[in-house]
Amino acid sequence: MFSVIVVDDEMMIRTSISAFINNCDVGFEVVGTFRDGSDAIKYLEENNVDLVISDIRMVQVSGIDLAQYIYENKPWT
């Protein structure tokens, strides 16, 4: 099972993507959802995931900034 986190500032989007992934039964499991890149970074500091699905435009930390953090600190994600 591959672990996934979903990062989006809109709850309906997070919920929809998570439900879709979890209901597809294709080997992916959503292990966390976050409304901002800063929340996702806090999670990633303590946990490893296989895939991050992120919005680009978010209030505090954008998806671009999150991608930069992942590139520098978790390149296997």
Predicted regions and their residues:
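His-Asp phosphorelay/catalytic-motif detector in bacterial-type signaling
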Residues: 2, 48-50, 74-77
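Acidic catalytic/metal-coordinating carboxylates
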Residues: 36, 61-66
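Active-site T/S-Asp motif of two-component receiver
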Residues: 5, 54-55
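Acidic, metal-coordinating helix/loop segments flanking the phosphotransfer/catalytic sites
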Residues: 18, 33-51
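Conserved acidic carboxylate
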Residues: 8
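Short amphipathic alpha-helix used as the core "switch/output" element in two-component signaling
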Residues: 42, 64-76
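Two-component/phosphorelay signaling modules centered on CheY-like receiver
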Residues: 11-32
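Receiver (REC) domain active-site loop signature in two-component systems and cognate sites
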Residues: 58
